Amino acid sequence: MFTIVALISGSGSNLRALLEACDSPLYPATVRAVGADRPAGGLEHAELFGVSTFVLEPAKFSSKEQWADLLLHSIQYHKPDLVVLAGFMRILPATVVKALAGKIINIHPSLLPAFPGAHAVRDALAAGVAVTGATVHLVDEGVDTGPVIRQTEIAIPAGISEPELHSLIKEVEKNQLVEVVREIAEGRLNLSELTK
């Protein structure tokens, strides 16, 4: 079975969609563990589905390197085929990215390369663009700079608020993430081809 470790920082709505998909015997992957950088609400989803969890708060470590080492060890302990950043709001340390190169994907609420970073929805509204969307991309050492795997566009309705737009994008992200993971697990999408 194709195995996943997911990393989160918040409520875990994308994680929940992935866990629900993996709960089906027809889905070709399983979430082996969920890690967080804080006591995130999304950990409850993992516990509900009987998935093991770990929390590693960077502030509780004497150095970033020590945190990075334990994060990498905690991920590798579960021997995942894929690491999914499902709302993980921290830049992965370069040592982690290098050790897991070609095996980490992220979901981002914009059409990258437009609006990278933590405030993509706010930035899209401030820029006055008519279209935004969601991107699944391979993680590299930059911030939202890795090769794009899949993008889905969303027209921005006039007068929409930031929370409303974020909610629309989240619905697209859930479906997009579940489908991309399915394609990777089934071998229909080869991540190594994106790193060439």
Regions found by a protein language model. Give the residues of each.
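Short, structured coil segments at secondary-structure junctions
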Residues: 49-50, 100
